[in-house]
Amino acid sequence: MSHDISKIVDSVVRQVLSDGESALKSPKAVKRPIPDRMTLAAAKELIGAVEKKAVEMGVKAVVAVSDASGNVVAVECMDDAYIASYDIAVNKAFTVTSLKMPTKDLAVLAAPGGSLYGIQFTNNGKIVIFGGGEPLMNAGKVIGGLGVSGGTAEQDTKLGEYGKMYFETQM
């Protein structure tokens, strides 16, 4: 047994000396496949990532994640976030799953003369037509929605886009 340990130690020392990197380093993280449905664990991870970015930006946000049907999977309110931001974030997550498009894209379409003029007054007022909502996709299929509210429309849009990018590249 001590002979086996000696071989392992020799191997580690040789590797450290040969390439200058520690053989004891943990292996690089392996990217996981994008989930095929929204789970509570995935929603919590995504919310945590968006909240971290919101802190960096100085935004007190509410972050909501829904499943493919627009039903809430998880919502978190950062300290001192606006009370109204809760419903707005949840409704952004609903909107993007319902219409399969980012909420920022609805502003032009919902303007007078636009092809979706007045859509924000449908679905009991749950359709949001300003930035901060992003559909979460896997293989071209919407599996969930992300809604962020608490900053300006531009800040919410940036946080939503960050969340979508995180979902696509880090999860």
Spans of model-derived segments:
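Flexible, solvent-exposed loop/hinge segments and secondary-structure transition points
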Residues: 3-171
